[in-house]
Design a protein with these regions (language model features):
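Active-site rim elements
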Residues: 106-110, 141-148, 155
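Sequence-structural signature of mature extracellular/luminal beta-sheet repeat domains
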Residues: 36, 117-118, 125, 129-132, ...
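Beta-propeller blade signature
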Residues: 54-65, 112-127
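Solvent-exposed, polar/charged alpha-helical surfaces in well-ordered, non-transmembrane soluble domains
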Residues: 70, 87, 119-122, 152
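Conserved loop/turn at the beginning of each blade in beta-propeller domains
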Residues: 19-20, 81-82, 140, 147-151
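Short pre-catalytic segments that frame enzyme active sites
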Residues: 104, 127-142
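A structural motif
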Residues: 91-98, 122-132
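Acidic, Gly/Ser/Thr-rich repeat motifs that build Ca2+-stabilized beta-propeller blades
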Residues: 1-108, 156-159, 164-171
Length: 172
């Protein structure tokens, strides 16, 4: 909507609607006024296995069109389960992007296993690169983008503007 008028946006990602999956979050880059970058988390059926899992995409938004789309992260493997995709996006004051992925209905294994994607909060540079000081960058077989693990289904996340701490809200 702009000035009370509805507009269509072209170039949106293919979003899989399955159970609790769909479009999860949209966040503008902190410098959106200069770079027009927008970020999405959504359920995607692309990748390994049947079903879907959570993806983080960046795109440029101009004149009601998304262009230069790039999937920055895609949880794998896909799951046919329809619950706990997460997800929220937040930027810290240093420009790092954080996003969450729910445990996808496997609460006893996924959150505690750093070789698996689900049940985590991730940290990336805004272009998708993995920061060299992430906690598990040098851990064999670990998902290098993990910032914290042991989460069930983080569907709320903010950065404390005074301390820089991540506040996340878990369901369940």
């Amino acid at each position: 909507f702009k000035n009370g008028k509805k507009y269509s946006v072209s170039g949106v990602p293919k979003v899989t609607v399955r159970g609790q999956g769909g479009l999860m979050d949209i966040e503008l880059h902190p410098n959106f006024q200069e770079n027009n970058l927008i970020y999405f988390t959504y359920a995607s059926d692309e990748g390994e296995g049947s079903g879907a899992n959570t993806a983080l995409m960046r795109a440029e938004f101009k004149e009601n069109k998304l262009s230069n789309q790039k999937v920055l992260y895609k949880a794998s493997p896909n799951s046919r389960k329809g619950q706990h995709f997460g997800s929220r996006i937040a930027f810290d004051k240093n420009g790092f992007i954080y996003f969450s992925i729910g445990e996808r209905g496997n609460r006893d294994e996924n959150p505690q296993d750093i070789t698996r994607d689900c049940g985590k909060i991730y940290r990336l540079y805004d272009d998708g690169r993995i920061p060299e000081d992430n906690p598990f960058v040098n851990t064999e077989n670990a998902k290098k983008a993990i910032w914290s693990y042991g989460h069930r289904n983080p569907q709320g996340m903010e950065i404390n503007p005074f301390t820089g701490e991540i506040w996340s809200h878990e369901h369940g």
